[in-house]
């Protein structure tokens, strides 16, 4: 299915609430209800959706995944768009939060099983990054592999320095030659921190 765009959220507070409402309904044959949902980075919606069939009382909980585009200031007036799918389609997006994955019932779909495994691997990687110690001013950071910079230098050891323009980020001063560097996504690199003596 393609993208569906609209000019309003039909009274809903935001994209997540709109999509929750779209996945919650009662029909003669089944009841559908969102048990838990999340809008990750304002671009992907994940939900644990419960289907209960009225004739058999069979209950299944599967993952709904929607790509989201939300721009309240869109020039053409189409402020919200989404593309929906479910886990059985094996979506590329695999950042589903663990609390949603924990609600899903077992499935036979190979694509869904692989997607769930990818989501759990990504969640473990996010936890590992979050638990990794952040460089603090005064420390020395030594990277396991040298980093290449646009000025042609390749360096692996820096002094961590407070950024005078931002209290949330730090700068890195080359230990041997001086000069300040910014290293984005520093936690994605393998390094060790050395405290000052």
Feature map (PLM): residue ranges:
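Exposed beta-strand-loop-beta-strand "reactive/processing" segments of non-cytosolic proteins
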Residues: 44-54, 66-69
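Short coil-to-beta transition motif at edge beta-strands of beta-rich domains
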Residues: 132-149
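Basic/aromatic-rich interaction segments and small domains that mediate binding to polyanionic partners
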Residues: 146-185
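A short hydrophobic beta-strand element
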Residues: 40-48, 141-143
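Negatively charged, low-complexity tracts enriched in Asp/Glu with abundant Ser/Thr
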Residues: 2-42
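Intrinsically disordered, low-complexity, charged/polar segments
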Residues: 81-126, 173-197
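A composition-biased, non-transmembrane "mature-region" signal
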Residues: 19-35, 46, 53-55, 86-91, ...
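A short, surface-exposed beta-strand/turn
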Residues: 61-78
């Amino acid at each position: 299915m393609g993208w569906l765009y609209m000019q309003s959220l039909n009274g809903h507070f935001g994209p997540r609430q709109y999509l929750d409402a779209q996945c919650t309904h009662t029909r003669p044959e089944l009841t559908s209800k969102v048990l838990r949902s999340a809008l990750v980075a304002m671009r992907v919606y994940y939900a644990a959706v419960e289907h209960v069939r009225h004739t058999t009382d069979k209950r299944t909980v599967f993952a709904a995944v929607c790509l989201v585009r939300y721009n309240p200031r869109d020039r053409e007036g189409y402020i919200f768009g989404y593309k929906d799918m479910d886990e059985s389609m094996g979506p590329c997006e695999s950042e589903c939060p663990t609390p949603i994955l924990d609600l899903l019932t077992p499935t036979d779909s190979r694509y869904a099983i692989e997607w769930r495994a990818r989501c759990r691997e990504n969640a473990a990687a996010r936890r590992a990054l979050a638990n990794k110690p952040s460089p603090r001013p005064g420390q020395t950071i030594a990277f396991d592999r040298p980093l290449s910079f646009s000025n042609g230098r390749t360096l692996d050891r820096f002094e961590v320095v407070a950024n005078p323009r931002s209290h949330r980020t730090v700068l890195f001063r080359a230990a041997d030659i001086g000069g300040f560097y910014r290293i984005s996504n520093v936690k994605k690199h393998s390094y060790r921190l050395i405290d000052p003596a």
